[in-house]
Amino acid sequence: YRVGGSPQKETDDYSVWTNDLLNKIIASKTIIQPGKATIGHQLINSDVVYVVVNGRGTMEVIEYMNSKEGHGSDPSRGIDHKDSYALTAGDVILVESGDYVKVVNESDHDQLAYLRIFDREGWRK
């Protein structure tokens, strides 16, 4: 199966392609433009494996004391632990269900691309 075709989500900052043909897992590809970032979101009902394919950037991960559904750029409720990881091609990162994730492309010239692999139960269309 290939993650390609038309983007499922597209903004000026980033694009997301998703392959939902498999029965138990979802594979998606995200490309972030130079100097841009994802909006950030909280993972619901699924751990997610991120595989950095190209570029460099940072990943902000916040663990909550009380998880709630949500998207947004200011996850200020009930923060238990906050980490920031430098990303480069070849990195593999596991983010657990309930955590908030935001990815920033730190390059002025190159795109940042990564794959996400997660359980179908955690997919928000």
Please provide the spans of the model-predicted regions.
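His/acidic/aromatic-lined binding-pocket segments of jelly-roll/cupin-type domains
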Residues: 29-30, 40-42, 47-52, 84-85, ...
